[in-house]
């Protein structure tokens, strides 16, 4: 095993500027605010850390599994909504009671998150670990912005 040489001093990565330069960051916050601000909502608790989530089809509907936690969902649209916010690392989210609101907003949310991910990863093509680190920091800023929305 070769010893690691000390890295030269590098400039700080401007996470906030990366998020602000992307139109998708503001779009995610705007879509979430539009979805939860348009009617009655309920609050669901999620895992609270960024973790890969998957949707499981069961006899009674769907479940979103993130790490050890499983959340029952009545339909696929709700499951996609919960999976997206579980993967972003939210502790809790507001879910509209009206599934048509969720169905209208989820494709745009998924596309915005995908665009944001590809944009950040394109900034660091030679170092995927650094890209993943920057993406985690950008998600943390997004979580703070969404938490700051009025209830």
Question: Where are each of the predicted segments found?
Answer:
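Mixed-charge (acidic/basic) macromolecular-recognition segments
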Residues: 88-150
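Short aromatic-glycine-(Arg/Gly/Cys) micro-motifs in beta-strand/loop hairpins
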Residues: 40-69
């Amino acid at each position: 095993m070769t010893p690691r040489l000390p890295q030269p001093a590098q400039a700080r990565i401007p996470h906030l500027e990366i998020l602000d330069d992307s139109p998708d960051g503001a779009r995610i916050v705007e879509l979430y605010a539009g979805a939860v601000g348009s009617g009655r909502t309920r609050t669901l608790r999620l895992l609270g850390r960024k973790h890969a989530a998957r949707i499981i089809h069961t006899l009674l509907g769907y479940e979103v599994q993130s790490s050890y936690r499983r959340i029952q969902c009545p339909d696929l649209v709700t499951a996609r909504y919960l999976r997206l916010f579980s993967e972003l690392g939210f502790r809790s989210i507001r879910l509209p009671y009206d599934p048509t609101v969720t169905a209208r907003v989820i494709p745009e949310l998924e596309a915005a998150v995908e665009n944001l991910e590809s944009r950040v990863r394109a900034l660091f093509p030679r170092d995927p670990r650094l890209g993943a680190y920057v993406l985690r920091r950008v998600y943390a800023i997004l979580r703070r912005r969404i938490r700051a929305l009025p209830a």
